[in-house]
Amino acid sequence: MKLTCMMIVTVLFLTAWIFITADNSRNGIENLPRMRRHEMKNPKASKLNKRGCREGGEFCGTLYEERCCSGWCFFVCV
């Protein structure tokens, strides 16, 4: 019985702690589903697509490396 009460109190305390310490900025948890829907409608809006890529003639390394804007790499971006 004591263990059950301690577990309930612990869960309530941790739940309250999460709500107290949660980030309350504009891009918080409440806006996350809205942002994800926007990214699904417009995949180019995703932050992952905004990575820097290398232009033609720059050193890239190995074959077909994703760092080139064109997607083709043979030691330099093609």
UniProtKB/Swiss-Prot annotation:
Disulfide bridge positions per record: 53-69, 60-73, 68-77
Organism of this sequence: Conus imperialis
GO molecular function, one term: toxin activity
Signal sequence, start to end: 1-22
Similarity section: Belongs to the conotoxin O1 superfamily.
Localization, UniProt: Secreted
UniProt keyword list: Cleavage on pair of basic residues, Disulfide bond, Knottin, Secreted, Signal, Toxin
GO cellular component: extracellular region
Propeptide: 23-49
Tissue specificity annotation: Expressed by the venom duct.
Highest taxon listed in the record's lineage: Eukaryota
Name of the featured protein: Conotoxin 5
Entry remark concerning the domains of this protein: The presence of a 'disulfide through disulfide knot' structurally defines this protein as a knottin. The cysteine framework is VI/VII (C-C-CC-C-C).
